[in-house]
């Protein structure tokens, strides 16, 4: 998968996860989660710009941003609550939509990291 296609796939997952937060309402989400999501959104915007403009740092940005989002989402959503920030998917009443949105974002982050890593490898002569 090309870096552009991987970025588009990741962006879909990122937006779906964000829409899930909007659907659930920000009153149920801790401030630390909102702050982390805001930082992630800024990084994703920079990444998107780098990829669309075919900037030479786009592959590195894909690995870094994809990896950071992957670690952040796993820590906040999948690891049992250990303190703020946490928005654990295992909580009672978690809906299928939330699982789906997070799952698509996580798969997109893995695809993004792999595409960035692949783009960093030298092409055979």
Where do the protein language model's features map onto the residues?
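Membrane-interface loop-to-helix entry segments
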Residues: 33-40, 96-110
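C-terminal TM-helix exit segments that contain a strictly Trp-centered aromatic cap at the helix terminus
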Residues: 12-24, 67-83
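Membrane-water interface at the C-terminal end of transmembrane alpha helices
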Residues: 1-2, 100-125
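Loop-to-transmembrane helix junctions at the membrane interface
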Residues: 49-74
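Interfacial non-cytosolic loop connecting adjacent transmembrane helices
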Residues: 24-32, 75-100
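Transmembrane alpha-helix entry/boundary detector in multi-pass membrane proteins
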Residues: 17-43
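Alpha-helical transmembrane segments in multipass membrane proteins, preferentially the mid-helix core
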Residues: 42-53, 113-117
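Alpha-helical transmembrane segments
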Residues: 2-16
């Amino acid at each position: 998968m090309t870096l552009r296609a991987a970025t588009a796939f990741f962006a879909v997952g990122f937006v779906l996860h964000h829409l899930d937060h909007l659907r659930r309402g920000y009153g149920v989400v801790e401030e630390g989660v909102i702050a982390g999501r805001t930082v992630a959104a800024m990084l994703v915007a920079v990444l998107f710009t780098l990829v669309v403009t075919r900037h030479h740092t786009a592959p590195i940005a894909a690995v870094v941003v994809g990896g950071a989002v992957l670690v952040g989402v796993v820590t906040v959503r999948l690891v049992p609550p250990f303190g703020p920030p946490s928005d654990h998917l295992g909580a009672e009443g978690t809906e299928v939509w939330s699982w789906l949105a997070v799952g698509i974002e996580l798969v997109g982050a893995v695809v993004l990291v792999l595409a960035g890593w692949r783009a960093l490898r030298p092409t055979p002569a």
